[in-house]
UniProtKB/Swiss-Prot annotation:
It is a multi-pass membrane protein. Keywords: Cell inner membrane, Cell membrane, Ion channel, Ion transport, Membrane, Transmembrane, Transmembrane helix, Transport. The keyword Chaperone does not apply. Belongs to the MscL family. Channel that opens in response to stretch forces in the membrane lipid bilayer. May participate in the regulation of osmotic pressure changes within the cell. Disulfide bonds: none annotated. It holds the Pfam family MscL. Homopentamer. This is Large-conductance mechanosensitive channel. It is found in: Cell inner membrane.
Amino acid sequence: MMKQFKEFAVRGNVVDMAVGIIVGGAFGKLVNTLVSDVMMPPLGFLTGGVDFTNLYFVLSEGSTPGPYAALEQARAAGAVTVNYGLFINAMISFIIMAFAVYLLVRGINSLRRKEEAAPPPSTKQCPFCLSTVPLKATRCPACTSGLEK
């Protein structure tokens, strides 16, 4: 049984999939950091200092009555909140991730693309004078020899 498991585990597809999952997880963290630490602060600055992580509304107050200055305070008080700012961050991360995957797949497909088949020839060579003649010709225009179809 261990031998079968070893054969399964070291098969190319399983190892490739494991590497893909690990690299994908790291790439996801990289994109999330890009969005939350690089893109959202300037976007917040351009929108008047809005911090998207603190965009939420309270459905039910917690043990400490609101209003809450930040989402962390609302969570600490046990308030029930809808965190649409975090959703905006996640949506932007998803769009960037999807676009990156699209570019990756597009690049791989262009590398794998097979050359298009050459169109069928429209001419042939006369066996007597070696002139180029149309494929459907029955007589060579240069030497007037009869040609086979």
